[in-house]
A protein has these predicted regions:
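C-terminal helical subdomain
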Residues: 170-173, 177-178, 194-233
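The beta1-alpha1 cofactor-binding region of Rossmann-like NAD(H)/NADP(H)-dependent oxidoreductases
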Residues: 39, 58-70, 101
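Active-site helix of classical SDR
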Residues: 119, 153-154
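A short, exposed helix-loop element centered on a Lys and neighboring polar residues
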Residues: 119-120, 162
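Residue(s) in the substrate-gating loop at a strand-loop-helix junction
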Residues: 138
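Substrate-binding pocket helix/loop in short-chain dehydrogenase/reductase
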Residues: 95-96, 100-105
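Conserved glycine-rich cofactor-binding loop
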Residues: 13-15
């Protein structure tokens, strides 16, 4: 059995998650990706030529049983787990004073509970490989924005990353928070268009994720904030 490293990525069928998966597969690693849309996952796999090292798993990052099942399926398929990337997330793009609360619960569960569930489900496997946890946050988790509930969820992810690091470092497990600025991804689909100014690509963020993941043993890169030039906040 090959001993190529194995990574599980939530929300891996498009955007940053898909770009990370491509980079890792190109490097000879094995990858499992989860997503809610089976068609999107199938299309992503087909786009890559249905590689043997890719496992696609339909499921919600915010459902405990489905996250546990994804970890178990990854271990069954590949026999190990070296890294998890908590990438699934979205924004309702509204405000606490004027927004529609109907969408807030799902956003908070996906963006905040989702990473915590992934950590809990995978930690035993990561202890065995002295692996890594990568949380995809946002600069919105460092900068206050009026009324921004999405930003509040990313502040929570910023805190979760450091709190997790302080617990799991004793077991040789690394934790990295990747906090992108404006990125050209499906994140903006619900806003009617891309924001003004320069944007990063999903591939550029993926390069930062893979760089953090592939640090030498014993090196733990904890926080990486990546903005496009010209983004002031």
């Amino acid at each position: 059995m090959t001993e190529a490293p194995v990574t599980l990525i939530t929300g891996g069928g498009s955007g940053i998650g898909a770009a990370v998966a491509r980079r890792l597969l190109d490097a000879g690693q094995r990858v499992a990706v989860t997503g809610r849309g089976e068609e999107r996952l199938r299309a992503f796999s087909a786009e890559l030529g249905d590689p043997a090292g890719l496992l696609t798993l339909r499921g919600s990052a915010a459902e405990h049983t489905q996250v546990v099942s994804a970890v178990e399926a990854t271990l069954k398929e590949f026999g190990r787990l070296d890294t998890v990337v908590a990438n699934a997330g979205f924004a309702t793009h509204d405000s606490v004073a004027e927004g529609d609360p109907a969408g807030w619960t799902e956003m908070v569960l996906t963006n905040v509970l989702g990473p915590a569930l992934l950590i809990r489900a995978s930690i035993d496997a990561l202890k065995a490989t002295r692996g890594r946890i990568v949380l995809v946050g946002s600069v919105a988790g460092f900068v206050n924005t009026p009324g921004n509930i999405y930003g509040a969820t990313k502040w929570a992810v910023t805190g979760l990353a450091e709190n997790t690091r302080r617990e799991v470092t004793q077991w040789g497990v690394g934790v990295t928070l990747i906090a992108p600025g404006r990125v050209e991804t499906p994140f903006w689909d619900g806003t009617g268009g891309l924001p003004p100014g320069e944007l990063l690509t999903a591939g550029q963020i993926a390069d930062s994720v893979v760089w953090a993941m592939t640090q030498p043993a014993g090196v733990d890169v904890n926080t990486v904030v990546v903005r496009p030039l010209g983004q002031p906040n």
